[in-house]
A protein has these predicted regions:
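Short, Lys/Arg-rich flexible segments
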Residues: 1-142
């Protein structure tokens, strides 16, 4: 029969607690970096051309919305919070009309121009979101 004797249990427990905190900090940082990557991509998608108010969409500028004032693009933000045992990065716009631009709306005379959902699809599909998360996590664990 073999036995393992730990004589410095308090030091071992302190070390594990410190490592646990390091993992939590790395997870928070990594989820935030992934959220910021999504925010950047969504802002890029929401910026396909510019024109003055009332001129309408500029043909040939791409599938996304044209920028008149930049309010939609500026309103896209990332918020990182901790809840229910996990970190959550919420990425999205704050202006009222953003949902109508993304999904369309029968009461809105404009055309739908998805910018947020395609941004997530692109970053997940090409592996960027995973790479950003993994690199950020590894950076904080050093």
């Amino acid at each position: 029969m073999s036995a393992i004797i730990v004589r410095n249990l308090s030091q071992v427990m302190n070390g594990l607690t410190a490592y646990d905190q390091q993992i939590m900090n790395a997870a928070e940082y990594a989820i935030g970096q992934a959220g910021f990557a999504l925010e950047r991509e969504a802002k890029k998608n929401a910026n396909t051309g510019t024109h003055k108010r009332g001129e309408g969409h500029i043909p040939g500028t791409g599938p996304g919305p044209n920028v008149v004032t930049g309010t939609l693009r500026r309103s896209i933000t990332t918020e990182v919070r901790y809840g229910f045992g996990s970190y959550i990065a919420t990425v999205g716009p704050t202006v009222e009309y953003a949902r109508a631009v993304e999904l369309g709306n029968p009461k809105w005379r404009g055309k739908r121009y998805p910018y947020l959902i395609p941004a997530a699809g692109t970053l997940i599909g090409n592996g960027t979101l995973s790479r950003v998360f993994n690199n950020a996590f590894a950076q904080r664990m050093r």
